[in-house]
């Protein structure tokens, strides 16, 4: 699943093509993806100008004066900017037409989403999918103190707390494993047993790893590609994720794989205590 870095890479890629541009049409090739497409989306967007783009966790936001288009890439989706005459393929479900170009959503597994939040319904932060999200890990509100305070009553394993998204948002399976490795914290450790000093290491690791992943175009394991059609290459720098049985890059101990909350977790049993 595309995580925060992949969505931010996508946002940065589409922003120059969308911001300030007038939507000339919308193409919907199914009734919906994970949820139905808004019934009047074509009429809602045609002739309107994109004011800005944003991101909240793993959600891409395209802002208009009268509301916000919310796009989620699901398990395997990606967005491309293409000439308007490029014919759609089997898994191309949604086009946002902008004159001679279009923004196309490709989603083979159809777990993504295209939704509309009208300005008259209040702040986009009030949307059902966004209202319970935690702080953004690359913004000032995220800190070791925040992690420490928010986890005093959380007995769940720290890896699962990071994935929950209600304390810090967008740190998915890949980057949670990598951040915990860099911070030298065992992913099974109950969150409330981690002290402020170790949360200092974890907060810094999360910031550094997410920033590096964005600069390297995200991670491409199966499906993700950037807006320009290029794959990300952060996966070349993994220390533990998807390296089961391989020697730790620090101490040579074999990387171990376990399952937490139906998700695979990778860690070094020697480096991460």
Swiss-Prot record:
One of its GO terms (biological process) is base-excision repair. SMART domains: Fapy_DNA_glyco, H2TH. It comes from the Bacteria. Keywords: DNA damage, DNA repair, DNA-binding, Glycosidase, Hydrolase, Lyase, Metal-binding, Multifunctional enzyme, Zinc, Zinc-finger. A zinc finger (FPG-type) spans 239-273. The active site is at 2 (schiff-base intermediate with dna), 3 (proton donor), 58 (proton donor), 263 (proton donor). DNA binds at residues 91, 109, 154. It catalyses: Hydrolysis of DNA containing ring-opened 7-methylguanine residues, releasing 2,6-diamino-4-hydroxy-5-(N-methyl)formamidopyrimidine; 2'-deoxyribonucleotide-(2'-deoxyribose 5'-phosphate)-2'-deoxyribonucleotide-DNA = a 3'-end 2'-deoxyribonucleotide-(2,3-dehydro-2,3-deoxyribose 5'-phosphate)-DNA + a 5'-end 5'-phospho-2'-deoxyribonucleoside-DNA + H(+). The keyword Isomerase does not apply. The keyword DNA-binding applies. Its cofactor is Zn(2+). CDD domains: EcFpg-like_N. Binds 1 zinc ion per subunit. PROSITE patterns: FPG_CAT, ZF_FPG_1, ZF_FPG_2. It holds the Pfam family H2TH. Its EC number is 3.2.2.23, 4.2.99.18. One of its GO terms (molecular function) is zinc ion binding. Belongs to the FPG family. Involved in base excision repair of DNA damaged by oxidation or by mutagenic agents. Acts as a DNA glycosylase that recognizes and removes damaged bases. Has a preference for oxidized purines, such as 7,8-dihydro-8-oxoguanine (8-oxoG). Has AP (apurinic/apyrimidinic) lyase activity and introduces nicks in the DNA strand. Cleaves the DNA backbone by beta-delta elimination to generate a single-strand break at the site of the removed base with both 3'- and 5'-phosphates. Monomer. This is Formamidopyrimidine-DNA glycosylase. The gene is mutM.
């Amino acid at each position: 699943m595309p995580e925060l870095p992949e969505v931010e890479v996508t946002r940065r890629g589409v922003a120059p093509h969308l911001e300030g541009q007038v939507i000339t049409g919308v193409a919907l090739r199914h009734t919906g993806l994970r949820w139905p497409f808004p019934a009047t989306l074509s009429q809602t967007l045609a002739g309107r100008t994109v004011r800005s783009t944003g991101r909240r966790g793993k959600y891409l936001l395209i802002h208009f004066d009268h509301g916000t288009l919310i796009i989620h890439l699901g398990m395997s989706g990606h967005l491309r900017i293409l000439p308007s005459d490029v014919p759609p393929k089997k898994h191309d479900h949604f086009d946002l037409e902008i004159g001679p170009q279009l923004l196309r959503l490709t989603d083979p597994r159809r777990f993504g989403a295209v939704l509309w939040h009208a300005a008259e319904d209040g702040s986009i932060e009030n949307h059902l999918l966004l209202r319970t999200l935690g702080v953004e890990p690359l913004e000032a509100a995220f800190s070791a103190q925040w992690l420490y305070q928010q986890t005093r009553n959380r007995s769940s394993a720290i890896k699962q707390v990071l994935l929950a998204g209600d304390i810090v948002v967008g740190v998915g399976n890949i980057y949670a494993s990598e951040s915990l490795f860099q911070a030298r914290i065992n992913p099974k450790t109950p969150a409330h047993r981690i002290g402020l000093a170790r949360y200092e290491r974890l907060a810094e690791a999360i910031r550094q790893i997410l920033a590096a992943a964005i600069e390297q175009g995200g991670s491409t394991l199966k499906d993700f590609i950037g807006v320009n059609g290029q794959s990300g290459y952060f996966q070349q720098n993994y220390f533990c994720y998807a390296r089961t049985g391989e020697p730790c890059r620090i101490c040579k101990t074999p990387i171990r794989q376990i399952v937490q909350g139906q998700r695979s977790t990778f860690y070094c049993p020697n480096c991460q205590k």
